[in-house]
């Protein structure tokens, strides 16, 4: 199988797309073309950022992702497409996939799968936050021939940085407030959770591109930075901050489920986040084996560095 050579990235200036592009640029010489597809609005509001990217050898293609002709034109000469579209625009990937399969050039598509595993177990099919990703997967797997387009799902589990933050308006749903020295731990004391930093999402996507094998194509690659527990995270905060006293409470899984139901019934914007935290607390991030080895076992971040970064971030606020 041929490795990625000419790459097009959708959502490059978004939350995760930025980290993916940041991982690609230092090894720019290993690829032919690196292009991004961005909206006219972004072209107007992020001019300085796009100009900097152009100087780094990135092609900037301006268009609307719903404009078939614009997307077809962008696909010319591209063999690998990476989507980093956000949760609210996931369904737009179906058009991007259809056009990629019809293109004579595009051979590999990485949809926006960064985050919770949407096919972890039987219950996953009914989880509200998963529905758009499930539709995209169903289309890609059932409606598109592998003769026309290969795929890879880079499944990272929760982002470490976001997991650390208390859920706005629903603090019982877990997180850490470094300034207030307050922590809400989820689940039983020994309950593990697997996390991936946003920087490592970029690293893991890059290494997927560099390892085009039968194992990495047409499969879900469940990768991560590290596995820990809420109690270990708390202990690391206390260690780095000199053992200062914290206000620590714990939310049981049963209580988290109650909070989830209440959030959906009252229409709280944080409902999706609470559902995801319930899934993670149930163990929906844990595997007997990771796919990091299939993509070259890249160097990733650890708990100590993540906690240090969070402390540094908060100190600047």
Describe the residue ranges of each PLM region.
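Oxidoreductase cofactor-interface core, primarily capturing Rossmann-like NAD(P)-dependent enzymes
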Residues: 2-33, 37-48, 68-69, 116-245, ...
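Conserved Rossmann-like nucleotide-binding pocket used by diverse enzymes
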Residues: 8, 61, 110
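N-terminal Rossmann-like NAD(P) cofactor-binding subdomain of oxidoreductases
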Residues: 28, 43-44, 51-55, 78, ...
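General small-molecule cofactor/ligand-binding pocket signal
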Residues: 35, 59-63, 152, 246-254
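Conserved Rossmann-fold cofactor-binding substructure of NAD(P)-dependent oxidoreductases
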Residues: 47-78
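NAD(P)-cofactor binding segment of oxidoreductase domains
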Residues: 70, 76-112, 128-142
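Short, amphipathic alpha-helical "lid/cap" segments that border enzyme active or binding sites
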Residues: 72, 198-206, 300-311
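A hydrophobic C-terminal alpha-helical subdomain
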Residues: 253-317
């Amino acid at each position: 199988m041929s490795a990625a050579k000419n790459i097009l990235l959708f959502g490059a200036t978004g939350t995760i797309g930025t980290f993916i592009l940041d991982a690609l640029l230092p090894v720019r010489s290993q690829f032919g073309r690196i292009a991004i597809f961005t909206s006219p609005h972004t072209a107007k509001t992020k001019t300085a950022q796009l100009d900097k990217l152009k100087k780094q050898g990135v092609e900037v293609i301006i268009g609307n992702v719903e404009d078939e002709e614009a997307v077809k034109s962008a696909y010319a000469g591209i063999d690998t497409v990476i989507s980093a579209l956000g949760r609210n625009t996931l369904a737009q990937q179906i058009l991007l996939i259809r056009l990629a399969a019809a293109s004579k050039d595009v051979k590999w598509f990485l949809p926006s799968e960064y985050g919770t595993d949407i096919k972890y177990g039987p219950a996953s099919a009914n989880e509200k936050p998963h529905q758009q990703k499930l539709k995209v997967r169903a289309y890609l797997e059932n409606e598109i021939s592998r003769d026309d387009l290969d795929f890879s799902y880079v499944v990272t589990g929760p982002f470490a940085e976001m997991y650390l933050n208390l859920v706005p308006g629903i603090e019982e749903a877990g997180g850490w407030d470094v300034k207030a020295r307050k922590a809400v731990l989820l689940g039983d004391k020994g309950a593990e959770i697997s996390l991936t930093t946003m920087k490592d999402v970029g690293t893991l996507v890059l290494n997927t591109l560099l390892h085009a094998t039968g194992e990495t194509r047409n499969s879900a690659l469940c990768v991560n930075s590290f596995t820990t527990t809420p109690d270990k995270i708390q202990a690391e905060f206390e260690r780095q901050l000199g053992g200062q006293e914290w206000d620590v409470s714990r939310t049981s899984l049963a209580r988290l489920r109650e909070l989830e139901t209440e959030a959906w019934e009252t229409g709280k914007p944080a409902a999706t986040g609470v559902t995801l935290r319930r899934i993670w607390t149930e163990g929906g991030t844990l595997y007997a084996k990771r796919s990091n080895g299939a993509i070259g076992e890249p160097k990733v971040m650890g708990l100590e560095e993540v906690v240090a970064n969070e402390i540094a971030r908060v100190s600047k606020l």
